[in-house]
């Protein structure tokens, strides 16, 4: 372990563009003064984005949950229903999904996340049909969806290789993977919270296959389910090693565990200081990953704003619909003007981005800020009472 007095040279080296080791990252994450760690991370960000370092981005997207039926039963999840639970379980029909896509386009959204449970009947063919239908009706929408866990599941259902599954859903319309299912990659914490999911090594292997086929992804981390600091850094190390080989991870997105309505209820959550330290150490350690995304959805708008001073260059999405983390207690909401204002008050120029992080609209003049009260995050969508396999669903106004 490095003595605290010896940490500043490591911070200086990282700020100047040098690579740090996992051991050094653990020392910094655990012991470096928060302000010093944040300053080094911000220096890395400014160096990487010299010329556009004054800009912070956001995206308008919709998370379309196509089913909550799932065989995986992760202990941190409050969203899923067991396959035999006909009172709680539901699936959306294609017409409903296409209607939600139409609303997304109308509100200026550019991306959809297709997220749901590991349904025992949904193989590759299901995703091919749905992605192809979405692309036919809305070719302008980017389908940034799923992750290695869904690929492993659909390939098993359809009795095909993971490589074939990726090729087929990519050809049908999938543009990139959302990094879903990473949770915690090291073996011990992963088995504790998601014992039925593939291993962390397998998750990375599938993402590496996808990158090799030209399908990029983001990477994520679920914080605060009982993992150690060393396991958090090991998660980063595993991502960095794959990124050295593929370059296919566009961004890293840590988010915090929400404790309501799940089997881990009462578990000590990651503190907001731990979250900011993770944003900072991720920016310092992941020297080969372009973007670090701050999350206001699980931590709140003020902490999301603070993340822009700790290495984040992006504030995530104005998520027009989200049901998964909200079911576990995340109740933060925002709208487009609030996100623009948060970024501006952090001393940055806000910009709406594409999935691939190109700037679509730079809001450099407040007088020209967009005004549309319908562009609101976190509109929940839940099933009407009933227990059929495909009940009618409705969109509820935010409360």
Swiss-Prot record:
Pfam families: CofH_C, Radical_SAM. Disruption phenotype: Cells lacking this gene require menaquinone-4 (MK 4) for their growth, and accumulate a small amount of DHFL. It comes from the Bacteria. GO terms for molecular function: 4 iron, 4 sulfur cluster binding; 7,8-didemethyl-8-hydroxy-5-deazariboflavin synthase activity; iron ion binding; oxidoreductase activity, acting on X-H and Y-H to form an X-Y bond; transferase activity, transferring alkyl or aryl (other than methyl) groups. Its cofactor is [4Fe-4S] cluster. Binds 1 [4Fe-4S] cluster. The cluster is coordinated with 3 cysteines and an exchangeable S-adenosyl-L-methionine. InterPro entries: Aldolase_TIM, CofH/MnqC-like_C, Cyclic_DHFL_synthase_mqnC, Elp3/MiaA/NifB-like_rSAM, F420, FO_synthase_su2, rSAM. Belongs to the radical SAM superfamily. MqnC family. This is Cyclic dehypoxanthine futalosine synthase. It comes from Streptomyces coelicolor (strain ATCC BAA-471 / A3(2) / M145). The gene is mqnC.
């Amino acid at each position: 372990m490095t003595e605290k007095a010896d940490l500043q040279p490591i911070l200086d080296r990282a700020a100047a563009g040098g690579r740090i080791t996992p051991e050094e990252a653990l020392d910094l994450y655990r012991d470096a003064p928060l302000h010093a760690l944040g300053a080094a991370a911000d220096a890395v960000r400014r160096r990487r984005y010299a010329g556009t370092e004054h800009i912070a981005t956001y995206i308008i997207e919709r998370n379309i949950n196509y089913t909550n039926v799932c065989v995986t039963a992760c202990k941190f999840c409050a969203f899923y229903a067991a396959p035999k639970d006909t009172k709680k379980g539901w699936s959306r029909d294609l017409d409903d999904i296409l209607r939600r896509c139409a609303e997304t386009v109308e509100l200026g959204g550019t991306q959809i996340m297709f997220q749901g449970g590991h349904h025992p009947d949904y193989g590759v063919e299901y995703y091919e049909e749905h992605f192809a239908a979405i692309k036919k009706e809305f070719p302008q929408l980017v389908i940034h969806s799923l992750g290695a866990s869904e690929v492993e599941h659909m390939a098993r259902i359809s009795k095909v290789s993971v490589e074939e599954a990726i090729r087929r859903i990519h050809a049908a319309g999938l543009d990139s993977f959302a990094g879903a299912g990473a949770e915690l990659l090291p073996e011990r914490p992963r088995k504790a919270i998601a014992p039925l999911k593939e291993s962390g090594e397998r998750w990375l292997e599938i993402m590496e296959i996808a990158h090799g086929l030209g399908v990029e992804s983001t990477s994520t981390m679920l914080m605060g389910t009982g993992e150690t600091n060393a396991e958090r850094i090991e998660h980063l190390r595993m991502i960095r090693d794959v990124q050295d080989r593929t370059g296919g991870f566009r961004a890293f997105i840590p988010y915090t565990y929400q404790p309501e309505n799940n089997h881990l209820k009462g578990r000590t959550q990651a503190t907001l200081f731990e979250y900011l330290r993770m944003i900072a150490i991720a920016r310092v350690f992941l020297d080969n990953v372009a973007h670090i995304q701050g999350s206001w959805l699980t931590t709140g708008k003020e902490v999301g704003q603070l993340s822009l001073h700790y290495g984040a260059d992006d504030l995530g999405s104005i998520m027009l619909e989200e049901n998964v983390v909200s079911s576990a207690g995340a109740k933060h909401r925002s709208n487009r003007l609030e996100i623009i204002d948060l970024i501006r008050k952090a001393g940055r120029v806000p910009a709406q981005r594409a999935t691939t992080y190109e700037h679509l609209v730079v809001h450099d003049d407040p007088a020209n800020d967009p005004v549309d009260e319908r562009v609101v995050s976190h509109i929940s969508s839940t099933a009407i009472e009933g227990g059929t396999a495909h009940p009618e669903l409705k969109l509820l106004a935010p409360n």
